[in-house]
Amino acid sequence: MAKEVKLKVGNEVATMILLEDKAPNTCKKLLERLPIKSQLIHAKFAGPEFMVKVPFFSDMENPATRQDQGNVCLNDPSQTMCVFYDSVPGMGPCTLFAKIVGNLEGIQKEGRKAWKEGGAPVEIYE
């Protein structure tokens, strides 16, 4: 069974499954650093995406350029976890390492709220 971690954005908590079979090094580095507390930064220029600074680097694995809603990727050069709360047609490749499977609606709500109002606190934990 896939490993699950929690993603708390503002007042909403979602469940993410880790894609350990496709991005084992990235998943391992995330798990080693849990819990992570950070701040949401909305990627207004890119669309329905927000970013979270994370305290690790990992080489590219499972590269993805088209992002579906619920995808969670690592943009390694900037130590940024990218959370796509709706689909984004095209962008530079990043490591797809997790998928939101529980309470995507809550994450979408917080993402849209951050679009208008600014950042929100973020926690990632087991």
What are these model-derived regions, one by one?
Residues 9-13, 78:
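Glycine-centered tight beta-turn/hairpin loop motif at sheet-sheet or coil-to-beta transitions
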Residues 1-4, 68:
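A short, compositionally biased
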Residues 18-126:
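Glycine-rich active-site loops that engage anionic ligands at enzyme catalytic sites
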Residues 3-10, 73:
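A short beta-strand micro-motif
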